[in-house]
């Protein structure tokens, strides 16, 4: 069995007016089906601003990359910024 890579991204909307649920759905739709989104958390930052934390899994392969994930995140309307918080190789 091949190894997988786990990624955790924190995504910020570009304004407080962004519907966080729609942003979450748009990002999941953009990443799927190529990348597996295991979990999404909503984080209250303050002043009405919320961030999304995406737990993503992908095969360890040249066909998959964190660079591509970031390109996909940038292409979603409403994404103001993102940060890769965690990156780890998983093998079972």
Curated annotation (Swiss-Prot):
Transmembrane spans: none
Keywords: Elongation factor, Protein biosynthesis
MF-aspect GO terms: translation elongation factor activity
Domain of life: Archaea
SUPFAM superfamilies according to UniProt: eEF-1beta-like
InterPro entries: eEF-1beta-like_sf, EF1B_bsu/dsu_GNE, Transl_elong_EF1B/ribsomal_bS6, Transl_elong_EF1B_B_arc
Gene3D superfamilies cross-referenced by the UniProt entry: 3.30.70.60
Family: Belongs to the EF-1-beta/EF-1-delta family.
Family annotation (HAMAP family): EF1_beta
The protein's role, per its UniProt record: Promotes the exchange of GDP for GTP in EF-1-alpha/GDP, thus allowing the regeneration of EF-1-alpha/GTP that could then be used to form the ternary complex EF-1-alpha/GTP/AAtRNA.
Official protein name in the record: Elongation factor 1-beta
Origin organism lineage: Archaea, Thermoproteota, Thermoprotei, Thermoproteales, Thermoproteaceae
């Amino acid at each position: 069995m091949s190894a997988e890579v786990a990624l955790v991204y924190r995504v910020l909307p570009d304004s407080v007016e962004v519907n966080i649920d729609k942003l979450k759905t748009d990002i999941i739709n953009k990443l799927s089906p190529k990348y597996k989104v295991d979990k999404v958390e909503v984080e209250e930052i303050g002043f009405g601003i919320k961030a999304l934390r995406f737990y993503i899994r992908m095969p360890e392969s040249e066909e998959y990359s964190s660079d591509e994930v970031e390109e996909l995140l940038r292409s979603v309307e409403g994404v103001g910024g993102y940060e890769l918080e965690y990156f780890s190789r998983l093998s079972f």
